[in-house]
């Protein structure tokens, strides 16, 4: 007996996504990032409450609202990761973007690992910081090897240099596209966190005391 046979709605085993047969029956399951609803047949249509983390040679995802307390985080199936560093996610397109300092590239893929591609690779050395502007669909990044902050469209085109003067080892970067500001850290001899317009203008220091290695920063919108 085929417990995952298609029904009248063309659903295998009555499951909206994955049907997993077992010895006595079958179990419905969901792709990475989606949650099985109470009917035990239907998956949510969009991911919700996710934690996405980079661990050098893999990128993992965990559902924070999972009904299964024993569920572990899942490895997103990506190829040839060498040293992933910065990571961001676009909820509109369901794509993740990450920098790989081992390969000196900026890459993207869908949350299920499909359509993996490199979007920026020329002229990069150590792209340690990455931020997605979801309003105008731009990528901002820092490069501690070229001492630059740059921007490009999310497909890597229309690339532009924003800040290069008086940068020693720019590290992390976050953006606030609603207000038109970006914030970044710099591991200079006297470390600093600065702000600037998203076009690189109006640059100023906002934190310059009691800093050592300001690796990660975030913003409260």
Language model segments and positions:
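Residue position within the beta-strands of beta-propeller blades
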Residues: 52-53, 98, 140-141, 183-185
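Conserved N-terminal segment of EGF-like repeats
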Residues: 1-65, 69-85, 100
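Short coil/turn segments that connect the beta-strands within blades of beta-propeller domains
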Residues: 48-49, 92-94, 135-137, 178-180
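Surface loop/turn motifs at the tips and blade-to-blade linkers of beta-strand repeat domains
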Residues: 10, 75-80, 119-123, 162-166, ...
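Short coil turn/linker residues within repeat-based beta-strand modules
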Residues: 66-70, 103, 113-115, 146, ...
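Hydrophobic core register within WD40 beta-propeller blades
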Residues: 87-89, 130-132, 173, 217
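Short loop/turn segments immediately following the C-termini of beta-strands
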Residues: 33, 54-56, 92, 101, ...
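Beta-rich catalytic cores
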Residues: 15, 83, 102, 126, ...
């Amino acid at each position: 007996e085929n417990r995952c046979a298609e029904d009248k709605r063309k659903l295998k085993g009555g499951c909206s996504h994955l049907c997993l047969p077992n010895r006595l029956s079958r179990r419905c399951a969901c792709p990475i990032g989606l949650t099985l609803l109470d009917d035990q047949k239907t998956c949510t249509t969009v991911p919700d409450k996710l934690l996405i983390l980079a661990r050098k040679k893999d990128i993992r995802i965990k559902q924070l609202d999972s009904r299964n307390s024993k569920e572990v985080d899942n490895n997103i199936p990506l190829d040839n990761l060498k040293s992933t560093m910065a990571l961001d996610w676009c909820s509109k397109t369901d794509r993740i973007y990450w920098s790989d300092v081992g390969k000196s590239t900026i890459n993207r893929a869908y949350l299920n690992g499909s359509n993996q591609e490199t979007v920026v690779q020329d002229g990069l050395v150590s792209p340690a910081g990455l931020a997605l502007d979801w309003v105008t669909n731009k990528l901002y990044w820092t490069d501690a090897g070229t001492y630059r902050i740059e921007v490009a469209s999310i497909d890597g085109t229309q690339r532009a240099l924003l800040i290069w003067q008086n940068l020693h080892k720019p590290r992390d970067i976050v953006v606030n596209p609603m207000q038109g500001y970006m914030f970044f850290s710099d591991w200079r001899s006297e470390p600093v966190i600065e702000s600037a317009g998203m076009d690189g203008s109006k640059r100023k220091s906002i934190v310059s005391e009691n800093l050592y290695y300001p690796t990660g920063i975030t913003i409260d919108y």
